Amino acid sequence: MSVSLSRLERQLGYSFKDQELMLLALTHRSFAGRNNERLEFLGDAILNFVAGEALFERFPQAREGQLSRLRARLVKGETLAVLARGFDLGEYLRLGSGELKSGGFRRESILADALEALIGAIYLDAGMETARDRVLSWLASEFESLTLVDTNKDPKTRLQEFLQSRACELPRYEVVDIQGEPHCRTFFVECEVTLLNEKSRGQGVSRRIAEQVAAAAALIALGVENGHD
């Protein structure tokens, strides 16, 4: 094992028994051979479970939608990338030459994906309890700063944060119709989300309100909220 990887293990607070798992977690798909995408898939599932379980215990009075919004904030790519940069994770990534030249070691999505892959690797190397311990340790300051006030965001913001946490494209809004007299108009808006087969719709006395209604409908269609939060 190289000195650099020993340093990374100290930063992560975990020493791998299987060094190949660690190396695989640090290997981007642009690098020749096997890559970290399967570990990322596993780590994402573990991260969401651990964060959800911790929020369930921390906020016993929170509604489902509130818990979902808090979790989306915890596991979004931006949060994970900040953690990854704190570990200097970009210095250890194995990238293809093209990705390396384009600055992939600084890219938010690549850093976040690699951190999720490391979570998956720790789980395979040492089991759920150790993976849970590491995740909660890394996210401790984020957990401490959370309050239910963080859930009081408008639907467009909540939808954007949810999609960002899944590394999905941002929603697209389009005014499809305007009805009524100039002093009393009704705007009809469609919201397109790549995860949904159908566009969500909203209407209101302004474009902004119609977009918020459409975003709220998209959150319900995605199963993030149930319409009663």
From Swiss-Prot:
Pfam families: dsrm, Ribonucleas_3_3. Its main location: cytoplasm. Mg(2+) binds at residues 40, 113, 116. It catalyses: Endonucleolytic cleavage to 5'-phosphomonoester. Residues 5-127 form the RNase III domain. It is an enzyme of class 3 (hydrolase). Its EC number is 3.1.26.3. Keywords: Cytoplasm, Endonuclease, Hydrolase, Magnesium, Metal-binding, mRNA processing, Nuclease, RNA-binding, rRNA processing, rRNA-binding, tRNA processing. Residues 154-224 form the DRBM domain. The active site is at 44, 116. InterPro entries: dsRBD_dom, RNase_III, RNase_III_dom, RNase_III_sf. One of its GO terms (biological process) is tRNA processing. Belongs to the ribonuclease III family. Digests double-stranded RNA. Involved in the processing of primary rRNA transcript to yield the immediate precursors to the large and small rRNAs (23S and 16S). Processes some mRNAs, and tRNAs when they are encoded in the rRNA operon. Processes pre-crRNA and tracrRNA of type II CRISPR loci if present in the organism. This is Ribonuclease 3. It comes from Pseudomonas fluorescens (strain ATCC BAA-477 / NRRL B-23932 / Pf-5). The lineage of its organism: Bacteria, Pseudomonadati, Pseudomonadota, Gammaproteobacteria, Pseudomonadales. The gene is rnc.
